[in-house]
């Protein structure tokens, strides 16, 4: 059972969820009477017609989103598959203007008798669009060429991993897009220069990470560039592409890279060299003009709460103490009693490092795949909803691996690409005892269950199943961390104390994130302080360029646990863990305040059943 302190902590979090996101839209506990539903047919149709059309127009703003979701079909999808999303400030303003218009139209539906699905859709759309509007004043606080999501790597990753390559038409679309890469990079460069003119520049250690990526991209000759070699690899067995046409496509791609793309990267390289002397070592966003307001907005965006940075910092310290006490007990059972938690975990890690002289990476990937298959079997009794799409484990590509974190990408809706759990394997040491918890988090029953199930939900509006309007990081990352805790609760680590310690270490890591993220951005922490606190260099640098996001994991998990505890307490024998999981996953990505209302309504329904 949860401790009194844990229950109090969760209650505090529950009380701080932003109620304004629903903006007067109350989610019903039971279906409306038939007469009311009949009278509401016209408004229902009006909302569906508007929301479907608005979502389509929103996707049209981002051709890359259209491709990753395959949102359209026929000629329109084919047209969008030939375009890259503009990266200009003007395009950003166009999106903000559209978001404002969307919120205005949603206001008009407040008084309409929408059904339950529509009310949830309206709440999710409103939350997402309001964030677009609220985030706009702080867009320049984010370094355009971030080592995690900047276009210098984002465009390459999209072209080599996401752009479909099924037939000759896709090859032609690839070349059309390739011809736009330099334009998009130049648009981003204009924005970066504008931000730099306002003293919005990254810390030196962040800039140098991005410089490394640009240098790495420019190192090979055009014919050996990843944008060319990937095209060659992906077309090698293409049935409707003749050898002559394939050779011509590769030659054209080589020419585009040489004549357009390499010069654009050289321009970015020169810009980075120009601002390098102006960079400093201060890590937090507070170093920038209006940085405190930017961080407050980031917390609201990523946690869906009104928690302050100080409150999050305190929650983190409390959770760290709780988890470390549990880890100490298990470490002592393995004979590791001397030193702090960090020292003893390093000693444990050393015991499980790969042995032998060969490259251990292929075997590690194979082990990850075995762990995912095992998790699928273990999850069978805990979930009614399961994804149809498979999930694969792959190593992060070389261009991004030096600074990448493990992550998950969705399967293609048409089945041409599985869900993918991407693992960075930099070496020379590897997180062997944390492999199971990472597999649960990123794949099964974590992100793959959550996101692939949502994509496959035929009873949701298309814009929700395809996550066109996000419900926020706290739901998605909170769920993934919740599944790590679930594995511990369900005894998946029975007879595997090192694996259990790896899982607890992962949870400790997320608790420390609360402390480190708020420390970096509001308490003057240096990069080295965060590293010394146990974050690691790559993770620390991620928090620097993505303020607030690290808070989503633990805050989201605590909220889901609080809601589960509430359901168990109020429903007693009527409570079902698989049914609770169905509820959390079945609505798709929603803000946590919306999830709270859904759980309350579900409890009311179950009591009446």
Predicted regions and their residues:
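N-terminal secretory signal peptides that target proteins for export/translocation
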Residues: 1-7
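N-terminal maturation segment of proteins
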Residues: 32-609
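Bacterial N-terminal signal peptides
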Residues: 12-26
């Amino acid at each position: 059972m949860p401790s009194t302190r844990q229950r109090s902590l969760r209650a505090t979090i529950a009380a701080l969820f932003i109620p304004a996101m629903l903006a007067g839209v109350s989610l019903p506990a039971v279906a409306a009477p038939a007469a009311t539903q009949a009278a509401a047919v016209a408004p229902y149709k009006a909302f569906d017609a508007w929301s479907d059309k608005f979502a389509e127009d929103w996707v049209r703003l981002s051709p890359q989103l259209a491709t990753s979701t395959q949102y359209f079909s026929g000629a329109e999808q084919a047209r969008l598959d030939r375009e890259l999303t503009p990266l200009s400030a003007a395009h950003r303003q166009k999106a903000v203007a559209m978001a404002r218009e969307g919120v205005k139209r949603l206001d008009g539906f407040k008084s309409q008798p929408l059904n339950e699905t529509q009310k949830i859709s309206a709440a999710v759309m409103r939350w997402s669009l309001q964030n677009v509007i609220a985030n706009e004043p702080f867009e320049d606080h984010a370094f355009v060429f971030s080592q995690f999501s900047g276009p210098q790597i984002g465009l390459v990753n999209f072209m080599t991993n996401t752009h479909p390559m099924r037939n000759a038409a896709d090859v032609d679309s690839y070349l059309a897009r390739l011809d736009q890469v330099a334009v998009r990079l130049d648009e981003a460069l204009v924005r970066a220069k504008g931000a730099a003119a306002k003293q919005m520049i990254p810390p030196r250690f962040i800039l140098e990470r991005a410089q490394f990526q640009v240098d790495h991209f420019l190192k090979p000759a055009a014919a050996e560039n990843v944008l060319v070699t990937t095209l060659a690899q992906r077309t090698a067995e293409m049935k409707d592409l003749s050898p002559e046409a394939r050779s011509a496509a590769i030659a054209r791609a080589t020419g585009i890279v040489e004549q357009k793309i390499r010069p654009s990267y050289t321009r970015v390289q020169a810009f980075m060299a120009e601002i390098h002397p102006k960079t400093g070592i201060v890590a937090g966003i507070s170093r920038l003009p209006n940085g405190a307001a930017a961080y407050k907005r980031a917390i609201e965006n990523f946690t869906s709460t009104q928690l302050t940075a100080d409150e999050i910092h305190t929650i983190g310290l409390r959770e760290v103490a709780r988890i470390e006490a549990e880890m100490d007990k298990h470490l002592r059972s393995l004979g590791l009693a001397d030193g702090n938690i960090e020292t003893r975990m390093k000693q444990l890690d050393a015991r499980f490092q790969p042995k032998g002289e060969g490259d251990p990476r292929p075997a590690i990937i194979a082990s990850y795949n075995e762990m995912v298959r095992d998790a699928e079997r273990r999850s069978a009794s805990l979930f009614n909803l399961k994804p149809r799409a498979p999930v694969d484990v792959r190593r992060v590509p070389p261009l991004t691996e030096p600074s990448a974190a493990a992550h998950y990408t969705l399967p293609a809706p048409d089945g041409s690409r599985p869900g993918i759990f991407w693992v960075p394997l930099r070496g020379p040491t590897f997180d062997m005892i944390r492999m199971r918890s990472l597999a649960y988090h990123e794949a099964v029953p974590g992100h793959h269950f959550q996101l692939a199930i949502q994509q496959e939900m035929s009873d949701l509006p298309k814009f929700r199943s395809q996550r066109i309007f996000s419900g926020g990081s706290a739901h998605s990352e909170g769920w993934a961390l919740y599944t790590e805790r679930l594995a511990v609760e369900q005894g998946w680590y029975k007879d595997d104390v090192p694996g259990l310690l790896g899982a607890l270490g992962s949870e400790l890591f997320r608790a420390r994130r609360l402390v480190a993220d708020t420390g970096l951005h509001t308490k003057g922490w240096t990069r080295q302080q965060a590293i010394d606190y146990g974050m690691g260099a790559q993770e620390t640098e991620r928090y620097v360029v993505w303020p607030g996001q690290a808070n989503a994991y633990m805050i989201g998990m605590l909220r889901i646990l609080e809601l589960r505890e509430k359901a168990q307490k109020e429903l007693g024998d009527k409570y079902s863990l698989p049914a609770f999981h169905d509820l959390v996953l079945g609505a798709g990505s929603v803000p946590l305040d919306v999830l709270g209302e859904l759980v309350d309504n579900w409890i009311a329904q179950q009591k009446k059943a």
